[in-house]
């Protein structure tokens, strides 16, 4: 039923909150410090101190095998996490582990360093296997920051793009519609 699903989502959200609250500031909690079926993590301070923005975190999550949650809505510089009832505990734990690992990466960055692991994310297979590697971190750190990725890696097909430009200049790379009609 709907009530059962809502309870499950709230339980999952509370679990995630408990796992990551030492590493991320959570906005808009209730009187008892709880969040409902979604939470907003505040990433704004990282920009000033480390030069890392919410989009850098979102792009790095791709290297960990996760599609980035909603960013900068409803609050600019934040990330909204909404676990669904279909996500099992193992997947939620992997997601929390990824966020905690990313926080550890953030604090190694400096404000003026635009050539760090987060700013270069996501890392494609083509990038990682190229002859040239001009980064101050290893290929393993880029591709396999946590051990579960060694046996279950999802590779991004593109590296960092200008999101605003891409949103304004969407170009379909599909075959012409006639090719699909023939088949």
Predicted regions and their residues:
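Non-catalytic terminal extensions of PLP-dependent enzymes
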Residues: 12-183
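Single conserved hydrophobic/aromatic residue that forms the stacking wall/gate
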Residues: 1-11
């Amino acid at each position: 039923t709907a009530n059962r699903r809502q309870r499950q989502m709230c339980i999952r959200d509370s679990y995630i909150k408990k796992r990551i609250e030492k590493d991320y500031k959570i906005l808009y909690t209730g009187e008892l410090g709880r969040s409902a079926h979604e939470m907003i993590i505040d990433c704004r301070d990282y920009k000033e101190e480390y030069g890392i923005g919410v989009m850098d975190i979102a792009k790095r999550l791709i290297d960990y095998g996760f599609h980035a949650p909603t960013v900068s809505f409803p609050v600019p510089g934040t990330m909204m996490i909404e676990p669904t009832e279909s996500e099992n505990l193992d997947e939620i734990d992997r997601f929390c582990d990824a966020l905690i690992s990313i926080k550890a990466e953030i604090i190694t960055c400096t404000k003026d360093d635009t050539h760090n692991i987060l700013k270069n994310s996501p890392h494609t297979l083509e990038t990682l296997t190229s002859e040239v590697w001009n980064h101050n971190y290893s290929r393993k750190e880029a591709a396999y920051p946590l051990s579960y990725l060694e046996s279950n890696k999802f590779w991004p097909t593109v590296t960092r793009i200008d999101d605003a430009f891409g949103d304004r200049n969407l170009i379909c790379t599909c075959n012409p519609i006639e090719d699909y009609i023939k088949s």
